[in-house]
């Protein structure tokens, strides 16, 4: 077993402090395989270690507060962004966040790849629309490309539910969603109607709504609704999930973050999703969206005003690290 020197020093210190101890420091250090000078240095810096431990614990409490915000698990990046949005903002190095999470055993579940299971087809199909989007998910700007899909939610207690969503490919904002216990196409049409009702002003004739080749999106009623709403339609190639990858990824993260185990009814499911959507749009910060939430990022793109103050790295400290020869000494 590879025991750190600091742990050996601590054992030696506790042994020396025992009233019935008959062993001297030299013998204990030799038996532990450490030097006397190293042990005395350990004793000399004891106060500094205690202060560091106290500081670490206080910082960990701040990290824990950010981690527990709204009840959804967060990784180091999400905690870093949450700290920036606190009042007042807390600036903490992400390496320190990772170190303290590891030190105190705070972990965020990492989503594992899972093959996407297709839902049972429920209605007749019509024409397949060309893949106009061609995976250009984010290059066209906000409200230009909308992604839509359906996923199922099951926990063994509540009825099986189906969730239809429409998200902005650029800002990742959830613009419309509907939950249903049936695969009948009405709830998919209602999702589009909600989109038009709440976001018509920000849409244009160039706005593209992209989906897979599910029967709902090939139905005559859906395609007519899209045309009547003055939107354009695009579809992924058959059996190619990569053509709608951001939407697939979105559902994966959603199921990771929402705890459906306590839901006993459709209403419980609805409440859980409504709370998460509000959190996701307003307080779930995304690293690739300049550390902003989807709604904040949309406002930033519209106004050009960045809402956060992020400290720049200490250039002097960086230069000291680069030119410090002790950092680059290697043992033979």
Q: What do these predicted ranges mean?
A:
Residues 90, 94-165, 190-194, 198-199, ...:
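Mobile-element integrase/transposase regions
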Residues 28-29, 39, 63, 79, ...:
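Mobile genetic element proteins and their domesticated derivatives, centered on retroelements
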Residues 227-231, 255-332:
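C-terminal domain-tail junction helix/linker
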